[in-house]
Amino acid sequence: MCIFDTIFLVIIMDKITIFLIRHSEQLKINTLLNNSENSQIANEKIILSVEGEKKAEALSKIKELSNLNSIWSSNYVRALATAKYIAERNNLSIQISTDLNERKIGNLDSLSKLRDKFTHTFTTEQLLDENLKNKDGENRFEVNRRMTSFINKLLAEYTGSKIAIVSHGASIKFLLMNWCSLNENFELFYKNKVLKIDSPSVIKLEFNKNSLLNLSQIY
């Protein structure tokens, strides 16, 4: 084996691909809970809609989500319900981390008062101000810190692997701010390409050790 073959082999072995997946379409429900703890529990238990189940199953069939080494999910029901189809097709067990949980919104009464002062949605306002925080909730900085810490653990432990992680809209956007910018419409973009974090969607992150090589939307 020549030196160039050796270098190429090392690069391949160090390469890690992470598929960052937003859960599928959730069931639309109304809640009258204003207590921060109760509303958080209710949010964690929201299931997928009938259409969301169909979309999650269709998502699992895309070619790039085959031959995975590991699949991770938040502990929210809708994330696990999305992950189950991918896990089944790859014959994997779902591993759970609360680091992948959605941004905690906090007290709904307090949020309602905050929204009266907003020009944009709460998530957009947080994208513009990493320290903006509702009572009993999380700001962008806090969510980014736990999401980034989780990604760094994967990069350290899963060299040469393909990993899927199922998370949530705000948390994914806050993580992507590590590499992306906002355009005039407050949309995330990377290398002039706009990213649509829909339910569901897949962002492919390719790393060599801790360095991002490429970021692209594949679904």
Show which residues each predicted segment covers.
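Active-site-proximal alpha-helix that buttresses catalytic centers in soluble enzyme cores
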Residues: 15-95
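Generic beta-sheet signal
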Residues: 17-18, 161-169
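Phosphate-handling substructures
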Residues: 27, 42-47, 88-146, 193
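Glycine-rich phosphate-binding loop signature in dinucleotide/nucleotide-binding domains
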Residues: 65-67, 154-161
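Conserved histidine-centered catalytic loops in small-molecule metabolism enzymes
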Residues: 66-99, 119-126, 203-219
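Short beta-strand scaffold positions
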Residues: 73-74, 145, 166-167
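Domain-level recognition of soluble alpha/beta enzyme cores
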Residues: 182-211
